[in-house]
């Protein structure tokens, strides 16, 4: 597989806009907000339900995860890759195990020019 150069223009704003269009097409702002509140409650107050897949039950929680946690994970991983100088590591492929939305693997891959392979047990994942 040929190496690709890192992305020069920041794709983050366009990606977030596309996420908004995709998820707000089917749900209202209030439904996404309610999903984010329920998802946050799971993470903070009812963590025992996470192992059973409760975080991704329902379209509101899935949209909230994609719209809030996906971009947060993207920005966090991109900052880590930049701070560690990991973009200079010679990578061809990044295996993103438990990829979820794929945001973390995408952030690293965009910094390095590597391909990314996302693997997740959820059918909803990227």
Briefly describe each language-model feature range.
Residues 30-87:
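Conserved Class I S-adenosyl-L-methionine-dependent methyltransferase catalytic core
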Residues 101-113:
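Conserved SAM-binding loop of SAM-dependent methyltransferases across substrates and taxa
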Residues 115-120:
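Conserved SAM-binding motif I beta-strand of class I
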Residues 37-40, 92, 111:
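Compositionally biased amphipathic helical and low-complexity segments enriched in hydrophobic
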Residues 90-100:
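Conserved class I S-adenosyl-L-methionine
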Residues 1-52:
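N-terminal auxiliary segments of SAM/dcSAM-dependent transferases
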Residues 124-125:
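Conserved short alpha-helix immediately C-terminal to the canonical SAM/SAH-binding motif I
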Residues 86-89, 108-109:
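Short, charge-rich binding segments
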